[in-house]
Amino acid sequence: MKQNSLNGWFKSGAPGVWMSGGAVSIAVIMTIGLLAVIAVRGLGHFWPADLIHASYDVPGQANHLVVGEVVQKEQVPRERLKSAGLPVPDQGPEFMTRELIKVGNRDLNGNDFTWIVGEWLTNQKTPPELMAVERREWGNFYGYLVNVKQDGKVIAEGEAAWPELQARVARVNELAAQLKTLEKSDIGAINAGLERIRLHGRKLELAGKLDATAQADLESERAELNARYQDIEARLADLHAQFNRDSLTARDANGKEIVIDIGKVVHAYQPNAMGTFTKIGFYFSKVWEFLSDDPREANTEGGIFPAIFGTVMMTLIMAMIVTPFG
């Protein structure tokens, strides 16, 4: 009787339903788990973490100053550090702290990150005037603001420099949006129009209808588009001149002063001086920027908008194609 009941249960298809449901549940759990791991590991990247200014004293070497953001800390065996060639004393705790510091200033130092031994950091401070400058190229710059210049002339320094810098960065970002519209939309439309005229002329030529009147009409349209292009080119030249007008002078950890064109600055902020709610607002603005902006620096910085749009569209199209066969 039990054998017949078991056979009937298998024939009813119920085991397949349970197996399919279990497989779907496992897939959903794995997907949620993967998204959770990505969120925990990745979303913290957008938080404006405090910046440190400290002295790094390696035994037997001249000390040097370190400015940057602590990204990661880990406990490593003393012997491991010693075997790596670091001058670690024989006596001491079994484990030492190793910290990954984002020092930025890649155009000056060659590296964005560096590993240091936490026990060798001394005089660690978080001065509120320490700033992070997110640039369109070469990554972040960490240091202190000295002054703001317009056409090479100092217009603000000291305490007045920071609000002036914020106003100039906002102005540059507005100009960048105008430049993007002109270069991608307006010039793109003109190029498309010129290509349409070329193809239409070729079509008339193949059909034997490219007479003097048709040629005159095509040339008239082409001249109109070229005139529009010259006008846009003049506007672009003017915008580029305004875009490159301002600059800032900053001082790095070692006291070296460098000049940064504000046209190359995306954001400038002082995380040590920001309150909790200010940091939360900045965090969500960075997340939105990541989702909506175009990439830059060979897809290593900026946003992911084109990629995420293509991925979502591909998923939807594949779902519509596959579902009828499912």
Language model regions located:
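Transmembrane alpha-helix signature in integral membrane proteins
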Residues: 301-325
